[in-house]
Amino acid sequence: ATPSPPTLYGLCSCEQPNTDGSLAYGCLAMDYIPQITSVSWKKDNEPITTGLKTYPSVLNKKGTYTQSSQLTITESEVGSSKIYCEVRRGESVWIKEIPDCKGDKVHPTVILTQSSSEEITSRRFATVLCSIIDFHPESITVSWLKDGQHMESGFVTSPTCGVNGTFSATSRLTVPAREWFTNKVYTCQVSHQGVTQSRNITGSQVPCSCNDPVIKLLPPSIEQVLLEATVTLTCVVSNAPYGVNVSWTQEQKSLKSEIAVQPGEDADSVISTVNISTQAWLSGAEFYCVVNHQDLPTPLRASIHKEEVKDLREPSVSILLSPAEDVSAQRFLSLTCLVRGFFPREIFVKWTVNDKSVNPGNYKNTEVMAENDNSSYFIYSLLSIAAEEWASGASYSCVVGHEAIPLKIINRTVNKSSGKPSFVNISLALLDTVNSCQ
């Protein structure tokens, strides 16, 4: 057979670049006799020795040969160089320049957007989003500047996402509200294929109404202290920035607390609770609520402990009944529990009927009030009951808890057959006091 030279074709993968950012070049040698000696690759005049895969030659039906070779290389390695395929047979050399596999350059559209002033104030930080849209090839560099100085932290750039041959990406900058409201200039800088684009956005000049967080600590309820083995401390943080961290400690030891809840009574509050033993609370130990946030120069701390009481005074408890003439004349009558002479002021008063708890909605307690000499306190509790229930002989108990009581709890019980309780006229002033406390 008469020798014939190879016909060379330069090939590119249909989708460039590949998902890993690499480019695939192909070299196809066809219709030659005899077989060729070698297939090699060059970048400009430099031999390429990695990323090569040359397939065995194939004898065609018409008696000629075909052979192919593939080069896998990254865009950055190619740069602006030209890629060549070189085929040898003996002393003969054939060279084919491979077409540019990088495709057309499409520079991105860069858009900056920011969160609203209301959101910045409520969440205590500003978010600036840099959207980088429709570019090719994939490789880009994103950086942020503040007043012209490169920033090292505070932003996150997402991986690129390819759709229909072009790519998109986003970069998100987070700025503390106090800093945002100081009129600084923030710049998103995008570099793509030798072209750099910058987009600027300026923080607000409106003063930030971002008051420092305020910590309020709430002790456990007196009922919990007297009746339960564990008690709950509550930390309410007002003016809390978004993402605030609230923790509890006791003498430098971290305590396991309930997850902080945001919001509380208002949109800027955080509530955190911790359960401790009642014994630890009664011992007077100090417990700390610690508030941390990136916008705070140092953590905020507040402490709480049970105050030592030196002059405990046990309450006296009496149940008073409406005037006798009212009992038979009305469908309802009132029982009043008078608790007086106690110190300190922390106390609980509730009712039971036949040893079952009465719904708190069915009775009303006044505020704890100081006696005339201001050395002790008193409180009233008013229970309204149906006359027929009283007539049936049901037993009603006023249950009082106070730390000065030896057994912590006092019960005073009354019913129709237990003997006549004291009959008193409930003054309008007392009723007004009860009603005003609801």
UniProtKB/Swiss-Prot annotation:
One Pfam family here: C1-set
Residues linked to a glycan: N164, N200, N245, N275, N374, N411, N415, N425
Region spans: CH3: 206-308
InterPro entries: Ig-like_dom, Ig-like_dom_sf, Ig-like_fold, Ig/MHC_CS, Ig_C1-set, Immune_Resp_Modulators
CDD domains reported in the protein's UniProt record: IgC1, IgC1_CH1_IgM, IgC1_CH3_IgAGD_CH4_IgAEM
Keyword Glycoprotein: yes
Annotated stretches, region: CH4: 309-418
Residue numbers spanned by region CH1: 1-99
Keywords assigned: Glycoprotein, Immunoglobulin domain
Region (CH2): 100-205
Top-level division of the source organism's lineage: Eukaryota
Protein's UniProt name: Ig heavy chain C region, secreted form
Organism: Heterodontus francisci (Horn shark)
Lineage: Eukaryota, Metazoa, Chordata, Craniata, Vertebrata
